[in-house]
Amino acid sequence: MKPLIVIALAVMLPCSIAALANPSGVTLLGWPALLVLAVGAYCLQWLAFIPARLGETERFYDLTGSMTYMAITLSAVGVSPSSTWPQWLVAALVIIWAGRLGRFLFERIHQAGGDQRFDHIKVSSSRFLVAWTLQGAWVVMTSCAAITVILSSTHPPVGVIFALGAICWLVGFTVEVVADRQKSQFRADPRNEGSFINTGLWARSRHPNYFGEILLWSGIAVMAVPYLSGTQWVVLLSPLFVYGLLTRVSGIPTLARRGQQLWGGDPAYQSYLAQTPRLIPRL
């Protein structure tokens, strides 16, 4: 598919969802507030793309994405017609997640000196722009449920559904943090150079960090349920988008190919693949 078509689809589909999910009557600059914030998310990616392309560097890619999450979340808080503790909680959860992951990925890419995913992309303006645009789509699609809650003028009672969503977020966030920390410690040990991780959470799932991320965004979507009505139910596509992207497009498939290149001939690795669940951890 041509880059311009990919870019157009990556902008139009999430922006359409943002327009449908916008709480009634909440505007920014005369337009639906959620749509304006979505467009702003893309604009931040495109602005960051310019110096990144000139320097042929991806070192600030993940950090830009995390800062975009925080920027649109704080902007939503600023323009929201309502201010209740559940809305503040949802905003805080997004900011905590984005701040933690942004710092982690920024430190990792600087320690590694780069990200191999971009080796053949950053030298092409069109392909690199696609990557930055897709990050904008990722931000908009994953955060739309949270932003819908923050912008809402309704005050539904906080009940079991909201609490269950918060618990899902907490469990998912904890799993992601622990998995990332375990892998970082594994890589930092010189004795593990050239080896694959199969200890800790990684002994129970081949991709526990992705499981945690899918679970936490599912939690945000569940927390949004009491606030949804009409076309706003479209935001429940958010966790499905996260799942699809991580399991079918850029996450697990990419790592699976790299794993086969590095350890495909290792019987221990093949045994690990056969005995360890791909995503949902074995209890």
Predicted regions, residues:
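Interhelical loop and helix-boundary elements at the membrane-water interface
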Residues: M1-L4, A52-T64, F106-L134, Q261-Q270, ...
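Short, amphipathic, aromatic/basic-enriched membrane-interface segments that mark the entry/exit
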Residues: K2, W31-V36, R53-Y61, A203-P208
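Hydrophobic transmembrane alpha-helices
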Residues: P3, I7-G25, A41, Q45, ...
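Short juxtamembrane and helix-loop transition motifs at transmembrane-helix boundaries
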Residues: A21-L29, F49-E56
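Membrane-helix interfacial "entry" motifs
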Residues: G25, L29, A33, E58, ...
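Loop-to-helix transition at the N-terminal end of transmembrane alpha-helices
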Residues: L28-L44, E58-M70
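Short, charged cytosolic
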Residues: W31-L34, L101-I109
